[in-house]
Amino acid sequence: MIKRSRNWIVANGVLWEKRVAVKSNIFIPILVLLFVATSTRGEFRAGIAVRVVTPDPLLPVSSGVGASNPVNKHEGDLTVRALVFADDDSKVAIVSADFLGFPSVLGDRARARVKGIPPESILIGATHTHSAPDCYGFADHSGKVSTDLKCVDLVCNRIAEAVNEALERVQPASLKIATGEANGRIAFNYYADQLYDPRCHVIQVIGADGKPFATLVNYAVHPEVLGSDAGILSPDLVGPLYDRIRGQGGGTGIFMNGAQGGMVTADNRGPDGKSLRTWAECLRIGTLLADEALRIVQSVPEQKNPKLSCAAKTISFPVESPLLRAVMKSSPLLAPTGDPNRVTTQLNLINVGSAQILTIPGEALPNIGYYLKRKMRGEHNLLFGLTNDAFGYILTKVDWGSFKRYDYISRTCLGEMTGEIYIDEALKLVAASPAPEKLIR
C-alpha cells in the first residue's frame, strides 16, 4: 500500500511543497511545486545587463536537426541579456540568448553559477535565430557532432555574468505594461498566412528619473530572415530590434519569443513572393517591430511598486518521436541520464504588476498560444516560448500527424500528447498561483 506524506519548507521567501510516495523504506519523488511569497515585498527594483557572445573565430550556424552550415562573416553581434526584477522577498531573472534553442542542461549549468537568485526563478529563453552556433549537439548524416563545447560553456558563463551584474545593478523602478497588435509586415504563418497572433506584449522599465532603461518585447516569430545557409552569423532581426529600441530612448532591449510554432515566421516576402534573405530585410523587420512595440507602450500609465511573484513546477513528457530519440542519443549534451523515454523540464509562471507570464519549453503552435492567453489571469498575458528548454514543436493531439503540412512539425514533436500534457500542466499552475494585480476597474 502506498501512503502519501507532505513536507513544507520555507527558505529565502520560497515555499516548497514536496509530495513523496512511500512504499516500505523506498522514497520516490513525484512532484516539486513552489511559489514565491510577496506579502511584505518592499520596494520594486529592476536591473539589466548584456554580454556579447559572438564567437571568435566564427563558428558554423544551425537551423535545426542535422549538420551546421559554414559562415564567412557576421552581421550584428550575438548577445545574452538578463533582466532582473526584485523586491524584498523575491528575485526573478529573465534571460534571452541569441541561439536557436538553449536546452535545460545548459540552462542549469548557467544557473549554478548565479549568486543571489534561486535557480527556479531564473528563466532562460532563446530568441530562435537560425544564424547562430548549435547548442544542442546535433549530429550530421555521418553521426559526427561538431558543436564547440568550449564555446557553449563560455555562453553559460556569460549568462551567469549577465544575471549577476543585472542583480547588482537593480534600482528603484516602475513598469509600463501594454498589449497591442503590431502593424505592418512583420510576421505571417508560412502554412496559412493569417493563422498567427499579431499581438505584441511590452514591459518597459522606468527608472527614478522617469526615463526607460529596459524594454522587453514579447512577440511570436521565427527570426530566420537570413537562414542558416547564407554564410552569415547573426542575431537576425533581433539585433536591429535592439538597436532601434536603444536609439529611440527605450533603453536596453530584451526579446522573448512566443508561440511561433507551425510555422510563424518573419514576413520577408518580396513583391514576387520570394523570400528576401538579406541583412537589409532584417533591418526593416527589426526596426518596424521595435517601433511598433514602443508605440504600443508609449501612452500607458506607469505601475508604481508592482507586485512580483514567481511559481515553478517540474513537468515531464514521454519521448515518442524516433527522430528526437535519435537526436538525444547522439548528442553529447542531450543524452538522457535517466529514463531515455522521458524528459523533464521546468515550467514557470510570473506575476508582475498587471501581467502574467507563462513559459513554454519549445515551439507551441499559435492556437495553443491563443487558448492559454484566454485562460490566464492577467490583464496582459505573455507567453515566453523556447524558455527553460527547447523540445521542438508542441502540437495538440488533433493537430499532431494530421495535415500533410504538419508532417515535419509532427516528426519534430516529442509525441502525440505533448501539447495536451503541456496545456494541462500549465493551466494547473495558473490555477494554483495567485492572480496578478488588476488595474482596469
Where are these regions (language model features)?
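Positively charged n-region of N-terminal signal peptides that target proteins for export
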Residues: 3-4, 22-26
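Bacterial N-terminal signal peptides
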Residues: 25-37
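Conserved beta-alpha junction segments in alpha/beta enzyme cores
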Residues: 42-284, 297, 301-441
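Anionic-ligand-binding alpha/beta catalytic cores of soluble enzymes and soluble regulatory domains
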Residues: 289
